[in-house]
């Protein structure tokens, strides 16, 4: 109404005056946006002289206040050089950082300054990686070195990052690309891309919107930095998260993770391959052969002296390679450094100005392994299950080793975890048997079968449950708050029921709690209310992103295969802010599969410590055979592992009188013993034996030289392809529905066989250009694990490629077990349907292939390797590949059944004697083996294995299995979507992927289009109340939500926004350089300085007012809302290693955007926005009225306090009011005025 009345009044002016008025207003706005506030004020005064409207008068008043504020702030913000790195950081921010955090910022800047494309910040959990990144970005933005940053993280960490940005850098423009409102997401992203700032999004949003994040106005958009938090999400290069992350163009990439290695070194390779864009560690095939295999073998207790020496030297070489790109500090390391330099951190304070707990004085942590005996009932079922086949048939749903392990783990925890049918057959109580159980539907509803059982029965059926109930009662009496972690929701159900019946006050977070606001509410309740003595959490959900320092005791009910998973759970308590001693109880049953799982945890931990530089030569606890024995039943009354650790570390325990009394009490509970997990690897091994071996063997030195040369060569090849544009990271084409459907109907047409393609730039023909001419002579047909293989040099001609290499006839090279040849091509990321391999295998067998994919090649023996690089040996790599690593590709064969048929085109290696085969046959064998590599960690799809060997496939391969199955389902869904009748009703944007590997393959390949959501073009107003000039011009721009205060409502997902303009960072936010003129308007303001808030508000004052008009027009997308719920539920899924669980794919992880199912109600302009990806349910009417009353009362109270001269109290009231309703310009300006008075 106000806008229409203003227009009516303007129309009463003469055309000349109206034109002048609108011109002055428009020019004044442009001047304000460009930072020229004096010119803007002058133009608004000219407009006022023509027609003095209320809006013009209001803007003149705001500009005058802003100019007065700037005039008072004549001094520049003060900056300090961080650790003499050259990066200037705002002094107030710098003084709040710990010393190790300053060193981390200097490391991040050194990556940029030295021209490295990326790196990994792998500090231990709880050392403040978030703060380091925020402070680093503050310095980079202040220096105008970056403009656009994309930050990707798990969903449950969004609020944490938004709060930290608002606290540490209130002047930084931070927007969230998340939530159910597509228009709001798009507007936030566009604002950052047009100006500068940080976009925060989630991995699930990345999966569904990677095209939008990678483009701007139809062109590829290159981010200055792409930063991944919890980067172990991409530990497998073939997962969809990793593929989509690679599709985002970026100048620099940073990874944050407290667990860079969780299971094997391939995960470390995957992280560096992404961070450094393939320019550091070569291809996965060569890395595994030259680095991973020797290092893993050297960590086993029964390794030979030569293997230990080789592993030590290879590990040192790997550390030298990654050192410039990798920084990791543990809590122990930082505390030790502080003890050596006590003056390093005097007078540190937190952002609120209060003294905080010095992290270097973190209290003691005792990590105890409590060895539990199985009860007679559990022991009887356990032994029978392992030894009798008919018992397995009763208890198992699918016959696979992994499913057997799942059943054994359930038996160790509680027999009631088995299905109701199995409980009835085992005569466990009088559990009911329903038809649902006959269909093997095991879900939470099965818990109803134990509702009628008494608590005493539930406790007495599990040795762990007996110990846990006694422990929790004792801890409650002592006044401790305890976290209880389990991988099973059913276990948490049992524990929760037992504790409630014992009148415990408990809280719980698991995968069923999908709303972030609900999780935060429970966390805050536990942190602030000591009456809640127990917090129940699933390991996967509660182990990441939570701070629960109110607890001092942690119970891990069941061990995970992944040592990092349990370590993350412990670090929810033992982190910065913890002031009390922490005790951890890991419950493990004696002689069972859990003890074997713990052994593998220790082995993986030794691998992690060595490869990340924590320990040069960690202690070796177990032999290879001991690690393999998963299904053997040991002594179930005592633990061999416990006795071994007792002998090694019994005298090293750090304790006090209270802890000694507590441990004595634990022994009274009938446990088998206690070990100290925190003392593992405290005994360093002498490297004398390895050093003696190094002096005697030139082979080891030459082997290390060879490994380094190969990865460097492959990395250089990758960089060359990237610089020549052969493998671009972003490709997009749009087609109309008719074109899509036309292409879709051609899927069944016979096509010439396409050549094999690679989907990652780093997984190319790894060493074909260097080693393709080597002939390997077999010395013995059947050999032990360490056989000899001799290498002679020959000249091999393959098509148009000519390879030549010369060396002495006596040189020796070694191949690891299971490798067909040195020249095998890594195709770990080759994505194909599972059934395609079987058909392809049959087809190749019909052609007469005799080579077995799993055939072992001659293995290693100590000798010498003389490597002479020659220019003639460097040949070009086959046809150019114009495909990026970020695209999921599928081939369609010309056969009737449409099975996949791939052919390798890499240069061949001639193998003499019995290993020789025709080139075509060997190519086929390599193609088969390449596909087998996709499943090498999958016991469910691999050929039957002996039970004792099965553990070799247990390296957390669920991601790979789910990835393969989900990609096949995704391919089917895409075909259906292309043929859908709805495709003809509206325009869709699609990504067309060309599967050609050469210019000639345009007609030989097929096109798969990825369906995206239809987009309705809308024009949104950027000005307030549909200004008069908008009515004349009819032009509108995007709207935006503003929250300019560091203490503003987190529900808005907005931190304060810096000044916009052609180069806003140069105008207000850059450190002052020598020789610059210091004026009141052009003084430098840091994003970390709260004084920058004044400029923020002035810059976007129109946007703040516009929210009142445009917020009512926002529409949310129910489809995406459901998608966000599904995302969080997926992120919270418990770890259940059963056959049925592992067989299920990640149904929500796809590259297509889901269609909205129904129109969403319009949101109120005054309603608070949801604080998570899941929209909050509509509040009741009375709650809305109460919130309105609270707002009015807070504003009134703030005005009264202001009149009384109580500035701080008034400011607090107004800030709380803004948290309820942040779009009131009057209250915001009043708040700014109070803040200004406090700063004077």
Curated annotation (Swiss-Prot):
Domain Helicase ATP-binding: 110-278
Domain of life: Eukaryota
Main localization of the protein described in the UniProt heading: nucleus
Composition bias type Polar residues, residue spans: 748-760, 795-809, 978-998, 1049-1065, 1135-1165
Post-translational modification: Phosphorylation by PLK1 prevents the association with chromosome arms and restricts its localization to the kinetochore-centromere region.
Keyword Secreted found: no
Residues of the Helicase C-terminal domain: 467-631
The reaction(s) this protein catalyses: ATP + H2O = ADP + phosphate + H(+)
Record-level GO cellular component terms: kinetochore
TPR repeat boundaries on the chain: 21-54, 1191-1224
Gene3D superfamilies registered for this protein in UniProt: P-loop containing nucleotide triphosphate hydrolases, Tandem AAA-ATPase domain
Acidic residues composition-biased segments: 1104-1117
Residue list for modification Phosphothreonine: 1057
Residues recorded with modification Phosphoserine: 14, 755, 773, 821, 966, 998, 1001, 1021, 1092, 1112, 1172
Task of the protein: DNA helicase that acts as a tension sensor that associates with catenated DNA which is stretched under tension until it is resolved during anaphase. Functions as ATP-dependent DNA translocase. Can promote Holliday junction branch migration (in vitro).
Similarity annotation: Belongs to the SNF2/RAD54 helicase family.
Name of the protein described by the UniProt record: DNA excision repair protein ERCC-6-like
Species assigned in the record: Mus musculus (Mouse)
């Amino acid at each position: 109404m106000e806008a229409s009345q203003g227009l009516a009044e303007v129309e009463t002016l003469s055309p000349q005056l109206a034109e002048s008025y609108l011109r002055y207003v428009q020019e004044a706005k442009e001047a304000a946006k460009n930072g020229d506030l004096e010119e803007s004020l002058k133009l608004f005064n000219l407009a006022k002289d023509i027609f003095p409207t209320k809006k013009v008068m209001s803007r003149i008043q705001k500009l005058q206040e802003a100019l007065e504020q700037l005039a008072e702030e004549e001094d520049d913000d003060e900056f300090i050089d961080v650790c003499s790195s050259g990066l200037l950081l705002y002094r107030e921010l710098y003084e709040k950082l710990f010393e190790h955090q300053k060193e981390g910022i200097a490391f991040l800047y050194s990556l940029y300054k030295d021209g490295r494309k990326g790196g990994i910040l792998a500090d231990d959990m709880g050392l403040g990686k978030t703060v380091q990144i925020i402070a680093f970005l503050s310095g980079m933005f202040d220096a105008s070195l970056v403009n656009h940053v994309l930050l990707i993280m798990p969903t449950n960490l969004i609020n944490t990052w938004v709060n930290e940005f608002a606290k540490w850098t209130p002047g930084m423009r931070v927007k969230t690309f998340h939530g159910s409102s597509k228009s709001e997401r798009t507007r936030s992203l566009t604002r950052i891309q047009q100006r500068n700032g940080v976009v925060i999004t989630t991995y699930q949003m990345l999966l569904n919107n990677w095209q939008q994040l990678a483009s701007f106005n139809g062109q590829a958009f290159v981010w200055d930095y792409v930063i991944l938090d919890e980067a172990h999400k991409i530990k497998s290069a073939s997962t969809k998260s990793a593929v989509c992350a690679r599709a985002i163009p970026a100048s620099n990439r940073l990874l944050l993770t407290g667990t860079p290695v969780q299971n094997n070194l391939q995960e470390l390779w995957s992280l560096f391959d992404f961070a450094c864009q393939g320019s550091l560690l070569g291809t996965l095939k060569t890395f595994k052969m030259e680095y991973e295999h020797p290092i893993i073998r050297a960590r086993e207790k029964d390794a030979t002296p030569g293997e230990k020496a080789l592993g030590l030297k290879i590990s040192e070489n790997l550390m030298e390679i990654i050192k410039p790109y990798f920084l990791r500090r543990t809590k122990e390391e930082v505390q030790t450094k502080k003890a050596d330099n006590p003056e390093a951190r005097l007078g540190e304070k937190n952002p609120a100005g209060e003294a905080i707990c010095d992290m270097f004085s973190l209290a003691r942590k005792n990590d105890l392994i409590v060895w539990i005996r199985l009860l007679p009932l559990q022991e009887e079922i356990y032994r029978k299950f392992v030894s009798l086949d008919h018992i397995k048939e009763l208890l198992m749903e699918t016959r696979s080793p992994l499913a057997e392990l799942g059943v054994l783990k359930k038996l160790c925890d509680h027999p009631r975890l088995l299905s109701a049918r199995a409980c009835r057959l085992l005569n466990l109580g009088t559990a009911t048997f329903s038809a649902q159980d006959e269909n093997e539907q095991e879900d939470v509803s099965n818990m109803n079968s134990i509702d009628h059982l008494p608590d005493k029965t539930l406790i007495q059926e599990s040795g762990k449950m007996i110990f846990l109930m006694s422990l929790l009662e004792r801890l409650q009496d002592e006044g401790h708050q305890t976290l209880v972690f389990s991988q099973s929701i059913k276990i948490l159900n049992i524990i929760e029921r037992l504790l409630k019946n014992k009148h415990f006050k408990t809280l719980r977070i698991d995968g069923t709690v999908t709303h972030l606001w609900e999780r935060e509410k429970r966390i805050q309740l536990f942190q602030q209310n000591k009456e809640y003595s127990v917090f129940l959490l699933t390991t996967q959900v509660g182990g990441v992103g939570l701070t629960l320092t109110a607890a001092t005791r942690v119970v891990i009910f069941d061990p995970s295969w992944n040592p990092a998973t349990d370590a993350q759970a412990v670090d929810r308590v033992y982190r910065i802010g913890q002031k009390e001693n922490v005790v951890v109880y890991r419950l493990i049953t004696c002689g069972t599969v859990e003890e074997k799982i713990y052994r593998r945890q220790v082995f993986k931990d030794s691998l992690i410590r060595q490869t990340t530089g924590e320990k040069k030569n960690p202690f070796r606890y177990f032999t290879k055979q001991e690690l393999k024995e998963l299904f053997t039943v040991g002594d179930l009354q005592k633990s061999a592992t416990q006795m071994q650790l007792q002998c090694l570390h019994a005298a090293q325990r750090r304790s006090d009188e209270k802890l000694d009394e507590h441990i004595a009490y634990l022994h009274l509970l009938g446990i088998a013993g206690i070990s100290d997990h925190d003392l593992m690897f405290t005994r360093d091994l002498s490297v004398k034996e390895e050093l003696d071996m190094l002096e005697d063997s030139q082979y080891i030195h030459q082997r290390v030289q060879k490994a380094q040369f190969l990865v460097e060569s492959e990395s250089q090849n990758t960089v060359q392809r990237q610089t020549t544009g052969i493998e671009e990271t972003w490709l997009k084409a749009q087609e109309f529905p008719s074109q899509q459907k036309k292409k879709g109907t051609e899927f069944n047409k016979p096509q010439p066989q396409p050549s094999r393609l690679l989907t990652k730039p780093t997984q190319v023909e790894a060493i074909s250009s260097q080693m393709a001419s080597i002939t390997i002579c077999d010395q013995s047909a059947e050999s032990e694990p360490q056989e000899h293989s001799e290498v002679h040099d020959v000249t091999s001609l393959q098509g148009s490629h000519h390879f030549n290499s010369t060396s002495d006839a006596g040189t020796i090279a070694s191949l690891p077990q299971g490798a067909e040849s040195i020249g095998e091509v890594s195709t770990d990321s080759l994505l194909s349907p599972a059934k395609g391999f079987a058909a392809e295998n049959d087809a190749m067998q019909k052609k007469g292939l005799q080579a077995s994919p799993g055939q072992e090649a001659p293995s290693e023996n100590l000798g010498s390797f003389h490597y002479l690089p020659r220019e003639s040996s460097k040949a070009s790599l086959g046809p150019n590949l114009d495909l990026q690593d970020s695209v999921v590709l599928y081939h369609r064969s010309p056969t009737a059944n449409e099975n996949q048929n791939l052919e390798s085109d890499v240069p061949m290696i001639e193998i003499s004697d019995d290993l020789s085969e025709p080139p075509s046959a060997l190519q086929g064998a390599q193609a088969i083996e390449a596909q087998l590599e996709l499943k090498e960690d999958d016991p469910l799809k691999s050929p039957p294995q002996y039970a004792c060997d099965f553990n070799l496939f247990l390296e957390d391969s669920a991601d790979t299995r789910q990835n393969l199955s989900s990609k096949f389902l995704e391919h089917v869904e895409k075909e259906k979507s292309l043929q859908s009748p709805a495709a003809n009703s509206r325009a869709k944007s699609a990504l067309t992927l060309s599967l050609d590997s050469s210019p000639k393959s345009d007609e030989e390949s097929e096109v798969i289009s990825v369906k995206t959501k239809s987009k309705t073009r809308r024009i949104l107003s950027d000005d307030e109340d549909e200004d008069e000039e908008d009515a004349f011009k009819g032009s509108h721009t995007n709207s935006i939500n503003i929250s300019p205060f560091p203490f503003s409502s987190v529900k808005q997902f907005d931190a304060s926004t810096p000044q916009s303009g052609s180069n806003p960072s140069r105008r207000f936010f850059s450190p002052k350089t020598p020789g610059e003129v210091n004026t009141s308007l052009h003084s430098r303001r840091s994003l970390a300085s709260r004084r920058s808030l004044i400029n923020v508000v002035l810059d976007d004052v129109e946007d703040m007012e516009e929210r009142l008009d445009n917020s009512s027009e926002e529409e949310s997308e129910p489809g995406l809302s459901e998608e966000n719920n599904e995302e969080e539920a997926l992120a919270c899924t418990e770890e259940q290693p059963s056959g049925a669980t592992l067989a299920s794919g990640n149904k929500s992880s796809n590259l297509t955007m889901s269609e909205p199912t129904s129109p969403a109600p319009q949101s109120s302009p005054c309603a608070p926005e949801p604080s998570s990806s899941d929209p909050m349910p509509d509040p009741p009417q009375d709650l809305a009225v109460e919130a309105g009353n609270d707002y009015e009362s807070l504003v009134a109270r703030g005005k009264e306090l202001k009149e009384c001269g109580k500035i701080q109290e008034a400011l607090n009231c107004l800030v709380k009011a803004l948290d309820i309703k942040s779009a009131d310009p009057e209250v915001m300006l009043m708040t700014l005025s109070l803040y200004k008075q406090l700063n004077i």
